[in-house]
Amino acid sequence: DFKKFAIINAYLLKSILAKKFSNKIKIKWPNDLLFKKKKICGILQETVNNAGKQFLIVGIGINTNFDPKNSSFSATSLKHITNKNIDNKKLLIMIKKNYEKLLFKANKNSFSELKKFTRKI
């Protein structure tokens, strides 16, 4: 059921960003992450049917190195939080590894690990 992935995606990204950058990052359901009520990440997902198979497409936008003073939206960035330039490649690799760990555990255990994960959320 792909609907659960909205929760999983938000929780996984929040966990990664909170651990690495600030524990003040919070989830705003269903698809945003906020830092002090300012948007730092947006998550979109869509299911697609192709040749009788269903696929999930997930788009993740993380504000990394922009200056929030130049934005007309209530947003912030990881650079603004940390006062450091963010290496986008390293951040992407970190996110990818965390997704791989979660999905490997889920696949290895017939998705029982994923079910446990969603129950914790």
PLM segments and residue spans:
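Conserved active-site carboxylates
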Residues: D32
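Long, positively charged amphipathic alpha-helical accessory segments at protein N-termini or as interdomain linkers
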Residues: F2-I25, F35-I121
